[in-house]
């Protein structure tokens, strides 16, 4: 396979015939958040809400959100594909269909979805399709997965507002996929809160420099 063919393959979602089979049992992961000590898989306090963000390599994306006041816990994992309970190595092949994502569990009385969305839009480049900077492939695509129709509508409205802001600077279009949440599979313990365990580790987050115009009032 030529370099061009290999590159093109990495930028395409796999067919059902190509996807890896995965497994029935979940991949073992940490029980508690390395930074906060809160449970990664719950139970969480009443009133918490959830959203999944994909914005390239999940190491830097997770750190971005665990630092936000009102975020109760974060976890990295895989979503949006077909392979059940994939490993990191399988996901990196591009043959699971999954994106690297961050689960953000937050208290809406302290931080709003709009505030989280503003961080999402400003801290990566949502116009790059199946890549994020030097990280190339469907695994690194930009996604927002919500857990109800109301939150999906909020996310779509934020996308439209940010698209206009980008267009005013000659950038775009936005390629971020927004849907209600598919199955989420927790990544291995090694990847959870990676940049807290490895402060000098890789972080590929790079924004466009365009501010998000979303109203941030509660």
Swiss-Prot record:
The gene is msrA. It is an enzyme of class 1 (oxidoreductase). Keywords: Oxidoreductase. It catalyses: L-methionyl-[protein] + [thioredoxin]-disulfide + H2O = L-methionyl-(S)-S-oxide-[protein] + [thioredoxin]-dithiol; [thioredoxin]-disulfide + L-methionine + H2O = L-methionine (S)-S-oxide + [thioredoxin]-dithiol. This is Peptide methionine sulfoxide reductase MsrA. GO terms for molecular function: L-methionine-(S)-S-oxide reductase activity; peptide-methionine (S)-S-oxide reductase activity. Pfam families: PMSR (PF01625). The active site is at residue 57. SUPFAM superfamilies: Peptide methionine sulfoxide reductase. One of its GO terms (cellular component) is cytoplasm. Its EC number is 1.8.4.11. One of its GO terms (biological process) is protein modification process. NCBIfam families: msrA. It comes from the Bacteria. Belongs to the MsrA Met sulfoxide reductase family.
């Amino acid at each position: 396979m030529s370099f061009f063919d290999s590159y093109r393959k990495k930028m395409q979602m796999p067919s059902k015939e190509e996807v890896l089979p995965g497994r029935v049992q979940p991949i073992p992961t940490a029980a508690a958040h390395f930074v906060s000590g809160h449970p990664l898989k719950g139970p969480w306090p009443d009133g918490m809400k959830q959203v999944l963000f994909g914005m390239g390599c999940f190491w830097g994306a997770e750190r971005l959100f665990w630092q936000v006041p009102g975020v109760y816990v974060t976890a990295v994992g895989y979503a949006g594909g077909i392979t059940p309970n994939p490993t990191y190595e399988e996901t990196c092949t591009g043959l699971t269909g999954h994106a690297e994502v961050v689960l953000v569990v937050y208290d809406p009385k302290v931080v709003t979805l709009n505030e989280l969305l503003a961080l999402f839009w400003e801290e990566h480049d949502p116009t790059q399709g199946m890549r994020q900077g030097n990280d190339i492939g469907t695994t690194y695509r930009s996604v927002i997965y919500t857990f109800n129709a109301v939150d999906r509508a909020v996310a779509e409205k934020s996308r439209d507002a940010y698209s206009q802001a980008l267009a005013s600077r000659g950038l775009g279009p936005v390629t971020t996929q927004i849907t209600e949440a598919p199955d989420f599979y927790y990544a291995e313990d090694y990847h959870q809160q990676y940049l807290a365990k490895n402060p000098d580790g890789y972080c590929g987050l790079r924004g466009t420099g365009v501010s998000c115009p979303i109203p941030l009032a509660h």
